[in-house]
């Protein structure tokens, strides 16, 4: 059975509502016996009035009979209302009729209302009050709005929402899914841009091929360079036209030639500034494949050898036996 909990509704069956309507439309009481006088009209008219919002229409005949019965005998109507409100048949939790009856009981319990007014509220003739309570129930059951939505509504954010915004059960739009989808799409686009940028790496510059000058062109350029190291614009253009070269080729050739000349000049200056080597008399050891020294002279190394720099004694190509003799003499010392 469906029971109304705190702020929640248990689902019900439409077929159960239709069955209840047919049973109550058969002029029979919930207990299966006729009610006291005047009650049958009120109980029979109640289901049609209670279900007017569910089925979209009301039975005009039942409403008319209810109004006539109310106008004819208010006392019997009050008795019927009290009996229907207190009896288990008027409070059925198996269908939405129980919710309607509960709402109308709330409307009927408003202080200051007369018995006739209570009967009219119970039968659905006074509908604005019941609709107000129903609206309050819907507001209580609706999900609470989040802080972000409240701040957006307060700040007056009227930005248009896309059709793909999801709708929550309470009717509130949830833009989170769209934002996630947008971020995912932007992440996908960013990933695609990065993939496109990776193969677009800067290509290594192609090595420029050197211009091949003929011997006649080089000879003429050398002759002009020895005569004039710097050329003006018209002179460069005239020389390039005479040699069938471009002005850029002539300009670069003169630049390279000036740099080459400068390096040669610096090397010559460095050699000129170096100290001159001293000339030392050296005894000839071998001449015409004949030894010019005694065996004991080679064993005595010169006394000034450790004190003098090595560049004073140039290297001589000695025969193998002389080198072995020098090594043996060094080992004995």
Swiss-Prot record:
Key word Metal-binding present in the record?
no
Tissue expression, as annotated, is: Expressed widely in mesoderm at the gastroduodenal junction (at protein level). Expressed in visceral mesoderm and embryonic skeleton. Expression is restricted to immature proliferative chondrocytes during endochondral ossification.
Give GO terms: molecular function aspect only: DNA-binding transcription repressor activity, RNA polymerase II-specific; RNA polymerase II cis-regulatory region sequence-specific DNA binding
- What Gene3D superfamilies does its record include? Homeodomain-like
Cite the entry's keywords alphabetically.
DNA-binding, Homeobox, Nucleus, Repressor, Transcription, Transcription regulation
One GO cellular component assignment for this chain's record is: nucleoplasm
**Where are the disulfide bridges?**
none
Location comes to: Nucleus
Feature: DNA-binding region: 206-265
Nucleus among keywords: yes
Q: Which InterPro entries match?
A: HD (IPR001356), HD_metazoa (IPR020479), Homeobox_CS (IPR017970), Homeobox_NK-like (IPR050394), Homeodomain-like_sf (IPR009057)
Task: Give the family per the record.
Answer: Belongs to the NK-3 homeobox family.
PANTHER family hit by this protein: HOMEOBOX PROTEIN NKX, HOMEOBOX PROTEIN NKX-3.2
Q: What is this protein called?
A: Homeobox protein Nkx-3.2
């Amino acid at each position: 059975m469906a029971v109304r909990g705190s702020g929640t509704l248990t689902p019900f069956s439409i077929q159960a509502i239709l069955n209840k309507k047919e049973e109550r439309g058969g002029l029979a009481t919930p207990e299966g016996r006729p009610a006291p006088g005047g009650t049958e009209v009120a109980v029979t008219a109640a289901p049609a009035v209670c279900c007017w919002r569910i089925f979209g229409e009301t039975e005009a005949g039942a409403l008319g009979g209810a109004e006539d019965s109310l106008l004819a005998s208010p006392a019997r109507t009050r008795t019927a209302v009290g009996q229907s409100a207190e009896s288990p048949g008027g409070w059925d939790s198996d269908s939405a009729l129980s919710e309607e009856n509960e709402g109308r009981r709330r409307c009927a319990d408003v202080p200051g209302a007369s018995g006739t007014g209570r009967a009219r509220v119970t039968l659905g003739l006074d509908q604005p009050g019941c609709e107000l309570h129903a609206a309050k129930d819907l507001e209580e059951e609706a999900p609470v709005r989040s802080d972000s939505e409240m701040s957006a509504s307060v700040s007056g954010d009227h930005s248009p929402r896309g059709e793909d915004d999801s709708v929550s059960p309470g009717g509130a739009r949830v833009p989170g899914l769209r934002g996630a989808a947008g971020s995912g799409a932007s992440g996908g686009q960013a990933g695609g841009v990065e993939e496109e940028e990776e193969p677009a790496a800067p290509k290594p510059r192609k090595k420029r091929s050197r211009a091949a000058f003929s011997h006649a062109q080089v000879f003429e350029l050398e002759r002009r360079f020895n005569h004039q190291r710097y050329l003006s614009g018209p002179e460069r253009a005239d020389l390039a036209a005479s040699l069938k070269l471009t002005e850029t080729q002539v300009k670069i050739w003169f630049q390279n030639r000036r740099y080459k000349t400068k390096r040669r000049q610096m090397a010559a200056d460095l050699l000129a500034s170096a100290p001159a080597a001293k000339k030392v008399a050296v005894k000839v050891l071998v001449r015409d494949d004949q030894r010019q020294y005694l065996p004991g002279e080679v064993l005595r190394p010169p006394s000034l050898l450790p004190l003098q720099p090595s560049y004073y004694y140039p290297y001589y190509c000695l025969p193998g036996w002389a080198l072995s003799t020098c090594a043996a003499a060094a080992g004995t010392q």
